[in-house]
């Protein structure tokens, strides 16, 4: 498998998720399966089926995270400059509406809209990589072409 690029923060977040899932997998789900078995006939036992399904889902996620972490390449904060690269915080202004947005450019595995983390593989993320303060980018959106100007680029 090829290397998976992650920021240090993204790597640590996945490690924590893995630890939490293993704990859940080892104790909570196993206990629920045990309790459901004690209820008797497994063929009509919805609690048993639900616990087994969750066990499968959690087990799959554990394997997925282990695969990502074993192939991870950590992206360290790059030097202070105004070029947009992975891990940088960016402030852009929509030139049509005047709205400003701040987010961090991250790998697809770390993208999280609610935490202001934009995937480098998204149309906007792709158009911003390598750009500098003052540059204008055009992004095709469902509502039409949007124009954004880079206002600031920061490491933190």
Swiss-Prot record:
Coiled coil: 1-32
GO MF assignments: DNA binding; RNA polymerase binding
InterPro entries for this protein: GreA/GreB_C_sf (IPR036953), TF_GreA/GreB_CS (IPR018151), Tscrpt_elong_fac_GreA (IPR006359), Tscrpt_elong_fac_GreA/B (IPR028624), Tscrpt_elong_fac_GreA/B_C (IPR001437), Tscrpt_elong_fac_GreA/B_fam (IPR023459), Tscrpt_elong_fac_GreA/B_N (IPR022691), Tscrpt_elong_fac_GreA/B_N_sf (IPR036805)
UniProt keyword annotations, A-Z: Coiled coil, DNA-binding, Transcription, Transcription regulation
GO biological process terms on file: DNA-templated transcription elongation; regulation of DNA-templated transcription elongation
One Pfam family named in its UniProt record: GreA_GreB
SUPFAM superfamilies linked to this entry: FKBP-like (SSF54534), GreA transcript cleavage protein, N-terminal domain (SSF46557)
Function comment: Necessary for efficient RNA polymerase transcription elongation past template-encoded arresting sites. The arresting sites in DNA have the property of trapping a certain fraction of elongating RNA polymerases that pass through, resulting in locked ternary complexes. Cleavage of the nascent transcript by cleavage factors such as GreA or GreB allows the resumption of elongation from the new 3'terminus. GreA releases sequences of 2 to 3 nucleotides.
UniProt xrefs under PANTHER family: TRANSCRIPTION ELONGATION FACTOR GREA (PTHR30437:SF4)
Family: Belongs to the GreA/GreB family.
Protein name listed in UniProt: Transcription elongation factor GreA
Protein source organism: Thermotoga sp. (strain RQ2)
Gene: greA
